[in-house]
Amino acid sequence: MFSYEKKLQYPVNIKKKDLRMAKYLVTQYGGANGELGAALRYLNQRMTMPDNKGKALLTDIGTEELGHVEMLETMIYQLMKDATLEELQQAGLDAHYAEHAKALFPTDANGVPFTVAYFATTGDPLADISEDMAAEQKARAVYENLIDLTDDPDVIGPLLWLRQREIVHFDRFKELFEYYQKMLKNGNNEMKIVDNKKMMLEDSQWYFNN
């Protein structure tokens, strides 16, 4: 069950219009390393984590990523809300306007629509958490690139906060990965997966031959 609070995780109050930056920011909304993909990745992977520790972490982080989506939507909207049609055309957003006017739509910075092909679920906790750690590092790198592209403190502040959350998430996933890895090394070769009914992973000891 989800509970919605009518406030952002970090305040967003952008005063200056910047269509160029709006065009860049959308990549962290609907791009390959963006927050929408992260939320869907974790909320799907959580169901086949082997215990409540893993399920809880992926639920918590996946839910937080939905809050990050809301932050980015707010930032993009504020950056372009007062733009004229001529300004949108000059910024290369005329194709977006043709289909969506000033409404939001998840794409990357090149206008490529969001796709679920950006993330995977395997049912293997170690494989999925490895992907999650890589995803957080890539998102951090993109936020750093975006920060380089603006000098507006009203934009930089939320981006710095989002970047820091990627670092925290990476650390939490790393801890979970090491926890499951240690569990298997200690001889627990059948990590129970709960998905309505009990299922068992095949012996995974071969992961740890070294």
Q: What residue ranges belong to the model's regions?
A:
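Non-heme di-metal
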Residues: 1-210
